Amino acid sequence: MKNFVLFVYLCIVCFGSGAFGQTGKYDIIVGGHKVGEFTTGKIEKGDTIVYKLQSKASVHLFVETTITYHLTSIYVKEKLIESTNKTYKNGDLHSSTTVKWSNGQYTIIKNGHTTTLDSPITFTSAALYFSEPSGVNRVFSESAGFYNKIEKNDTDNYSVINADNHHVSHYTYEDGTPTKVEIEHHLFDFTLMKNN
């Protein structure tokens, strides 16, 4: 356990310094204009995988608004053990979700509300940026705290349907990673375009 904690700490330090095992960088596009950047990182050692997703965008929502997003997900033996997701609006915490496996179940805390889940989570939103979900029919959203449906549309193209509001995100893959992600959002739709 001590070695696991040390590994996770080192992963977070490495992620903070930009030393990722696998990385991706995307432009965030709204209305045809670049408004920010989205970065992805994955590092693995033995049977432990750590994913980190980060973004920062400035959009006009009646006034100029800067939105930052941070997600860290830790898997051990292909099972989610812990994730932390925080979104900030103009520097103030806007939403927070934590998921933690302990004593045979997950405790999910979203904005102060707690739920539990008994079955192991093996595929999450963070993993979508590093592996094509071939044969997968649902994905756990670390930010929402629940499962969303995945549908394969055609070769290398998938839809993720939000179980709460039925918004649809489209993922287009090339060589196992998404090159384009179109996201339907209640405030505005946006697109992630891979640029490396």
What do these predicted regions represent?
Residues 31, 81-195:
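Solvent-exposed helix/loop surface patches that form functional interfaces
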Residues 19-21:
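N-terminal helix-cap/turn-to-beta initiation motif at the start of protein domains
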Residues 1-5:
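Positively charged n-region of N-terminal signal peptides that target proteins for export
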Residues 23-100:
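N-terminal mature ectodomain segment of secretory-pathway/periplasmic proteins
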